[in-house]
């Protein structure tokens, strides 16, 4: 909940005909749902660091129906809540929907945590979130991030924290409408988005197939309105190509949806067994994450080192997460690098950490987002659902990177011009892989002498 300003009582009696009408709280009962969720493991970045739905690990589960115990301690703890609820529901001069009050109380629980990755979701937001994770949803086909002038993640949209397009999905309505990487979105359907979070804006942009949303876009100093007709978006998370005269296989992952691991396995197998590439580049830049089991399977395609990473609950010891058998490129004679930046978050950081920490690949680019928690996604029947941070994930040497990120072995800061055609990071990746194939030593940057300590206080939501 947000604090509302409180005005001092007036000593003058105003003319009642000039008084504004009392706000009416929603009074229509909300439909109940009998949906039952199955247990899944997911990792998503809600836009993820700067946005992009970035980054969070999730477990989707079913509420067991248990309620807090009725001990004297709990009764004392909840007495102020029930006193306030009873007083409002019985004595508030306007109309009151008890479901609306309960929803507000649930929101308050999650807001009190101060964790942007733990959040109450309305039924619409809950469905949209799960659709985005699965790889299919109705929208326009944009991935975005909130970034400051230096390209670093930031929180709520402001004059110094702008909502920037980081990826336009192939064959999407946004691409057909002319949207480009680097575009800055300043308004949706004519309404400015200053003060909103990236999740707020994504909710505004998504909508039923066939409807139109108009984005106000700033590009190269010019402002324009771009109408886009929404459609079903099929995310194509994994693409590949052959570089350097057939010597290097390049794989780009834009997100970790339910089919990403199999898609990557198929493309990687083709690169290694059909194209006979000798080295690999895995591009995880601006990848906000997705399913956590996809991250485990994708890391297993490149290394059989054990453990890949660790998971830890609030009260338990770290538990190792093991590789799956049958990886298509676990042969360490195939050199590889991973390209990363500040938009590399959550599931993509798990893969990056597994490959860097097990000495399978060098990281090239800039420091990653720093999303080190895993969320549990649960449905509240008839009342939406929520995501709650329930576990940490740790690198192979049990380092927690939350709010800190992974530091690349070779640091290359992103260009100020997000739309410039030259890709210095990819060029460096090609250079490093070719050097390793030739047996030439590769010079890496020294590790940082000091880095911020991980914390569960709010980090920029993505």
Locations of regions flagged by a protein language model:
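Terminal targeting/pro-maturation regions of precursor/exported proteins
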Residues: 2-119, 459-461
